[in-house]
């Protein structure tokens, strides 16, 4: 089973061009399935049946795994079995018809517009790290990139004169996104210190040693910026969520936001309509003279 899993992971990495972060998530989930199979004497993928997979899901749910995590595990299992069936290594899919237990869908955390501007409009030292980090923050918020999309950017993916960036999203799907004026200015300032012709790596964002910056390093730099400028926890995906929420709030164009984010299914994008409603409700509560009743006037 491990050998076939290794072959599947190699397929995802080399042919599907899945990011290392996503690949590690798939591997962790499928390792749980292998551990369950070993525990129950299941020697190969063909022998795993729907009843056993359902039992594993129930056990993990009982031990506190979220519905979202279990849905991701089932998605990983389905992907593996699609590969095994296509390669003639298996003739069924035990995940067919299975779904994760329903859970409450949490709304993504976002910065409001004022907080986003507070983060980005602070003073920036004219040094290598500060200029790089500012360009990272501006590009996340300007274009709504995923972490893997940002760290995989090469110099020829950006056209600052045209204000465009080409990214490779999930499933190897390419899309072209606009880059705002402030982000272009931050990138130009970063390029002056980066030394375009010197470092070995063609990555847009590099370390002092000239190597492509890692996703973990970006997470730490974004976290540090959030603590320094806002006094709060901040992660790259919160900037992507903020980008989506603010564009939707201004444009009311859900399809456009779907395209910008690279979502295959618009239902994934629709969660931002709930955030927009929360904003509208807050505006209503603060602005409408009869939106709130004072205490003691409830009779």
Swiss-Prot record:
Belongs to the 'phage' integrase family. XerC subfamily. Forms a cyclic heterotetrameric complex composed of two molecules of XerC and two molecules of XerD. Keywords: Cell cycle, Cell division, Chromosome partition, Cytoplasm, DNA integration, DNA recombination, DNA-binding. The keyword Signal does not apply. It holds the Pfam family Phage_int_SAM_1. GO terms for molecular function: DNA binding; tyrosine-based site-specific recombinase activity. CDD domains: INT_XerDC_C. The active site is at 146, 170, 237, 240, 263, 272 (o-(3'-phospho-dna)-tyrosine intermediate). PROSITE patterns: CB (PS51900), TYR_RECOMBINASE (PS51898). Site-specific tyrosine recombinase, which acts by catalyzing the cutting and rejoining of the recombining DNA molecules. The XerC-XerD complex is essential to convert dimers of the bacterial chromosome into monomers to permit their segregation at cell division. It also contributes to the segregational stability of plasmids. GO terms for cellular component: cytoplasm. InterPro entries: CB, DNA_brk_join_enz, Integrase-like_cat_sf, Integrase_catalytic, Integrase_recombinase_N, Integrase_SAM-like_N, Recomb_XerC, Tyrosine_recombinase_XerC/XerD. It is found in: Cytoplasm. It comes from the Bacteria. This is Tyrosine recombinase XerC. One of its GO terms (biological process) is DNA transposition. Residues 106-285 form the Tyr recombinase domain. Residues 1-85 form the Core-binding (CB) domain.
